[in-house]
């Protein structure tokens, strides 16, 4: 063994060994349980960042740990490779998106391999490869045939800078999440998936995910946004253009007697009839244009001024018969409920602000109990609390929460309304007017209409030479040789769909492809997905809580219904790791606070980078980058190396690796000879077994990687104490070898390269990852001595070390002999002595 820890030579050596021997190529052995460990695959931007290092280091600890525990472990990696950045690079650098993407993949693969991550690279997938997107297209067709994919004209989120449509989830505070441009509304023919058909199942089945963070489940629950209410019909006083009523959705039917106006979203389908030929038509259309230029977020924000315009029309309250003025307003969205809202200004703050601005009457219909009666003349804000109904006809006197059902009953009985469950979730818009995505496999024929591309004609391949000028249409429209085709049904002239799919479609099923990545004839083989699914541990950022995780759950449920998979949920357990920060903020190039993983690995080694990032914070918390912390992790590995080096010659003469407790005792000898050891040797055994127990539980039960590493560091500290305290000739070398073996084995998932090298020194022969995970003996965890806290009248006054297991009377006697105790109780009478064995003595005096 060389004296100096040469991390560069060691890491290259073992990375080559793992590659040459196929160490992490999946070996599916019968009789072993399966474990599918998966980190969210990255977009191939070209370089890893520290966030990548963190998530992949976490996953690698879990995968290596489970491998050593005897599982068949599936631990794959791939690339979420379609997307707009490749097109932007094509425009900027004059390089085809495919070339840019594959070059980035090659570089990032090399970087991942330099980290020593235990991926089975034979299962690598890239969503931009025709062998992959062929099956993305095939899955689209399965949804299409099941009636879950459809095309319609819709007001969509349009990013003028990206010149493409965005899903609702890709609009953040009214801005494009990719380029921060203000998002506009635009009416286009678009493709959708009917995710709303699965809204209730997506909501209910969150209860089947105890291994998911509550925060993520709450985010999905809020995004699905289930509510229960009624749809009530307000007849138009003067029907116009075929419109004779306006239907509202409300969860507050208890306030229906307090309606004093009606509001429509400017996009509501009845608006054209109300506006056309209206004496105020020009004014109304100008207002509509103004509102449609605003983002939905801005329109509904609490601090946005509520703006509206009276249409000149009235409708009739279905329960009071009163005339209600119909307004258009910016704060009502067509996509939620029916796009029509009843205004109850006395009991809704938003309505109160609107009514105050436009001098609309208010009517109190709920009086709070135990408080002075509300008077609309004196109200400066809406009353939104509970109380008894007033001015509500036959329902006066009812508690408003009780009135919800009886008023719904009356509306249904009179045919003026129906109970309704509503969801905030909208259907998933998957069309993108971009090139670098999976082409939608549909052909349009003048004779046959919309025709699905037959399976045998998949994949619909992307052409390689297209124009990338943002125009609002897909760049594929510049290639007649792509879109001009033959109708597969009638043989006539056809035109291909030129939109491509949202990249989230590609990532909604990749975990299934990993089960059978090379199969040319199937998206995945049934027997393989039946064996591997669902994913036992999924790891990735909480920023994907709504988008990717919701879509992956939807896809899995659809495939379950189509009898293509046997699981309804894709991910059994989910870990959402925190961000890597510098100076309290997320690392980013724009802030100039990034750290290059390549530079850290070159300077300190991959094991140091991994160890620091796993030790610095619990995985679910944000991690503050620290150069000193990195240097500390590096010093620890040097210290470990020197420790093994110091014993390398002596342990070489001891056969085996873990040799048990007594000198020369074979592996597996139990506690029958434990207490024949001297106290120093017993403490070495205790520390070794405690560390195994602690690391096993911290990885296997809690994912507390930071405390596991801390326990390993403490074991090294004790080892140095043992080495310095016990004379060399009295040191129990078989026990030293046993303890070093356990130390290296439990560190192996965290720092794989150095542990491979040290395992060879200890005498392991085979790779450390061919070894079983070490066990521990509970009897070995017992300390020789324990610390007893001494209290007087409940206050801690002293501490005493006594033999473990010493009986209570003997402990009391020792406590009463202590000088400090005698001084404190002098002149007082002892009323009671309370003893908690091995922990505490409390002396009660007066």
Curated annotation (Swiss-Prot):
User: Main location per UniProt?
Assistant: cytoplasm
Q: Pfam families attached here?
A: Anticodon_1 (PF08264), tRNA-synt_1 (PF00133), tRNA-synt_1_2 (PF13603), tRNA-synt_1g (PF09334)
Reactions that this protein is recorded to catalyse? tRNA(Leu) + L-leucine + ATP = L-leucyl-tRNA(Leu) + AMP + diphosphate
The record lists ATP as bound by: 589
**What domain of life does the native source organism fall in?**
Bacteria
**Carries keyword Transit peptide?**
no
Localization annotation: Cytoplasm
Instruction: Recall the GO molecular function terms of this protein's record.
Output: aminoacyl-tRNA deacylase activity; ATP binding; leucine-tRNA ligase activity
Q: InterPro entries given for it?
A: aa-tRNA-synth_I_CS, aa-tRNA-synth_Ia, Leu-tRNA-ligase, Leu_tRNA-synth_edit, M/V/L/I-tRNA-synth_anticd-bd, Methionyl/Leucyl_tRNA_Synth, Rossmann-like_a/b/a_fold, tRNAsynth_Ia_anticodon-bd
UniProt motif ('HIGH' region) ranges? 42-52
Keyword Protein biosynthesis present in the record's keywords: the answer is yes
GO biological process: any one? leucyl-tRNA aminoacylation
Q: What is its EC number?
A: 6.1.1.4
Entry GO terms, CC: cytosol
Question: What keywords are assigned to this protein?
Answer: Aminoacyl-tRNA synthetase, ATP-binding, Cytoplasm, Ligase, Nucleotide-binding, Protein biosynthesis
Name of the top EC class for this enzyme: ligase
The UniProt entry annotates the motif 'KMSKS' region at 586-590
Assigned protein family: Belongs to the class-I aminoacyl-tRNA synthetase family.
What's the name of the protein? Leucine--tRNA ligase
């Amino acid at each position: 063994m060389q004296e100096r820890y040469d991390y560069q030579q060691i890491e290259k050596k073992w990375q080559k060994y793992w590659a040459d021997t196929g160490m992490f190529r999946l070996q599916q052995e019968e009789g072993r349980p399966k474990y599918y460990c998966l980190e969210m695959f990255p977009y191939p931007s070209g370089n890893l960042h520290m966030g990548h290092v963190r998530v992949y280091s976490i996953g690698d600890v879990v995968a290596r740990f489970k491998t050593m525990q005897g599982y068949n472990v599936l631990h794959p990696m791939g690339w979420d490779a379609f997307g707009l950045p490749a097109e932007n690079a094509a425009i900027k650098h004059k390089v085809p998106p495919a070339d840019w993407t594959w070059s980035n993949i090659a570089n990032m693969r090399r970087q991942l391999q330099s980290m020593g991550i235990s991926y089975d690279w034979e299962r690598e997938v890239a969503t931009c490869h025709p062998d992959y997107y062929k099956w993305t297209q095939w899955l689209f067709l399965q949804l299409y045939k099941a009636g879950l994919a459809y095309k319609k004209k819709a007001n969509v989120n349009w990013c003028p800078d990206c010149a493409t449509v965005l899903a609702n989830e890709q609009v953040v505070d009214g801005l494009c999440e990719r380029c921060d441009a203000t998002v506009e509304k635009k009416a286009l023919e678009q493709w959708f998936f009917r995710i709303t058909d699965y809204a209730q199942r997506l909501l209910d089945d969150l209860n089947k995910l105890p291994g998911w963070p509550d925060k993520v489940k709450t985010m999905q629950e809020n995004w699905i946004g289930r509510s229960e209410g009624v749809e009530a019909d307000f007849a138009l006083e003067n029907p116009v253009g075929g419109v004779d009523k306006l239907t509202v959705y409300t969860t507050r039917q208890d306030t229906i007697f307090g309606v004093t106006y009606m509001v429509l979203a400017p996009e509501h389908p009845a608006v054209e009839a109300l506006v056309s030929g209206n004496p105020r038509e020009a004014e109304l259309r100008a207002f509509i244009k103004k509102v449609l230029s605003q983002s939905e977020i801005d329109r509904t924000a609490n601090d946005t001024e509520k703006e509206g315009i009276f249409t000149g029309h009235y409708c009739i309250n279905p329960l009071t018969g009163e005339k209600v003025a119909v307004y258009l307003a910016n704060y009502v969205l067509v996509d939620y409920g029916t796009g029509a809202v009843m205004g109850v200004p006395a009991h809704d703050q938003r309505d109160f602000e609107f009514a105050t601005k436009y001098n609309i009457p208010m009517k109190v219909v709920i009086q709070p109990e135990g408080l002075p009666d509300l008077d609309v003349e004196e109200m400066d804000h809406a009353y939104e609390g509970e109380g008894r109904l007033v001015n509500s006809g036959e329902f006066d006197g009812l508690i408003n929460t009780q009135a919800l059902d009886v008023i719904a009953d009356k509306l249904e009985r009179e045919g003026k309304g129906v109970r309704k469950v509503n969801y905030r979730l909208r259907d998933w818009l998957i069309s993108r007017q971009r090139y670098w995505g999976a082409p939608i496999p549909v052909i349009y024929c003048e004779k046959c209409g919309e025709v699905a591309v037959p399976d045998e004609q998949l994949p619909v391949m992307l052409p390689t030479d297209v124009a990338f000028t943002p125009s609002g249409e897909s760049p594929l429209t510049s290639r007649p040789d792509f879109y001009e085709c033959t109708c597969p049904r009638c043989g006539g002239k056809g035109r291909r769909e030129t939109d491509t799919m949202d990249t989230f479609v590609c990532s909604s099923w990749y975990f299934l492809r990993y089960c059978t990545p090379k199969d040319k004839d199937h998206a995945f083989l049934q027997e393989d997905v039946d064996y591997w699914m669902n994913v036992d541990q999924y790891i990735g950022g909480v920023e994907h809580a709504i988008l990717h995780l919701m879509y992956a759950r939807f896809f899995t449920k659809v495939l379950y219904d189509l009898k293509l998979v046997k699981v309804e949920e894709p991910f059994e357990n989910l870990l959402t790791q925190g961000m890597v920060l510098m100076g309290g903020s997320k690392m980013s190039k724009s802030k100039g606070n990034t750290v290059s993983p390549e530079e850290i690995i070159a300077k300190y080694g991959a094991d140091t980078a991994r160890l620091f990032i796993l030790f610095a914070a619990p995985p679910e918390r944000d991690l503050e980058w620290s150069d000193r912390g990195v240097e500390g992790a590096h010093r620890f590995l040097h210290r470990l190396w020197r420790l093994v080096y110091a014993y390398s010659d002596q342990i070489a003469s001891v056969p085996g690796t873990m040799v048990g407790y007594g000198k020369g005792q074979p592996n597996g000898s139990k506690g029958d000879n434990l207490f024949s050891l001297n106290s120093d040797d017993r403490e070495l055994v205790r520390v070794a077994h405690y560390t195994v127990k602690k690391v096993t539980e911290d990885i296997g039960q809690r994912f507390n990687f930071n405390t596991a590493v801390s326990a390993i560091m403490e074991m090294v500290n004790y080892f140095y104490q043992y080495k310095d305290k016990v004379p060399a000739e009295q040191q129990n070398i078989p026990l030293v070898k046993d303890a070093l073996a356990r130390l290296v084995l439990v560190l192996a998932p965290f720092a794989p390269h150095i542990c491979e090298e040290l395992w060879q020194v200890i005498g392991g022969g085979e790779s450390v990852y061919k070894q079983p995970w070490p066990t521990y003996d509970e009897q070995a965890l017992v300390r020789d001595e324990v610390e007893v806290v001494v209290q007087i009248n409940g206050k801690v006054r002293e501490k005493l070390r006594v033999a473990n297991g010493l009986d209570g009377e003997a402990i009391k006697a020792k406590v009463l002999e202590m000088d400090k105790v005698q001084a404190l109780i002098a002149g007082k009478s002892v009323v009671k002595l309370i003893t908690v064995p091995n922990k505490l003595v409390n002396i009660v005096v007066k």
